[in-house]
Amino acid sequence: MRRLLYSCLFALMASSSVAQELVIRDVFRQMPDSLMPYLSTNNRLDFMDFLDSKMKAEIKNQFDGKSEMTALTDDSLSIRMNDALRVDMLLLKLDEPLDTISYVLVLAETFKTDSVYGDKSIKFFTPQWQQIRRDIPWNDIQRKRINSLGLQNILKWDEEIINRG
């Protein structure tokens, strides 16, 4: 009887710790429209539904153009907003909380200026979409992932151009 009780308690504790893990789709779903005027809430939900159904995640955006979510994992996503703008997001768990913040969302926008270079803008948010304007204690792996976003975007554009041709 005691073993059964301990087993049940262990299973309950394990399931509650899993339930607390945050994934990027939950944060993306709650994103304010003002931060990404290209996409409505329904557009964002459609992206995830299409990818979950193994379909191409392309939608008509708010400016009558086409936008496509090209990747979605538990901690990252990529969206080609149009031919000149790509958005990447990373959801990174901090090794040690910053005040009450355990996760930070990295929002990287890369504006293509020519075939080789792009202008990159990176902002940091809490999972509740409050912008963070202070130093964040990244570990080395997190820092490398953030720094790779700009180059990754440019390489993806070149690959898309080659694949279209």
Report each predicted region and the residues it spans.
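Structural motif
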Residues: D114-F124
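Terminal domain-start segments
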Residues: Q20-E96
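Short aromatic loop motif centered on NTY/YTY
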Residues: D135-G165
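Short, hydrophobic/aromatic-rich segments at coil-to-beta transitions
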Residues: D74-L77, I101-L105
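Structural signature of eukaryotic scaffold interfaces centered on beta-propeller domains
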Residues: M89-D99, K156-G165
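Short loop/turn segments immediately following beta-strands, especially the blade-tip
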Residues: P127-I136
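Bacterial Sec-dependent N-terminal signal peptides
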Residues: M1-I24
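Short beta-strand elements that form the blades of beta-propeller/WD-repeat-like
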Residues: S102-K112, G165
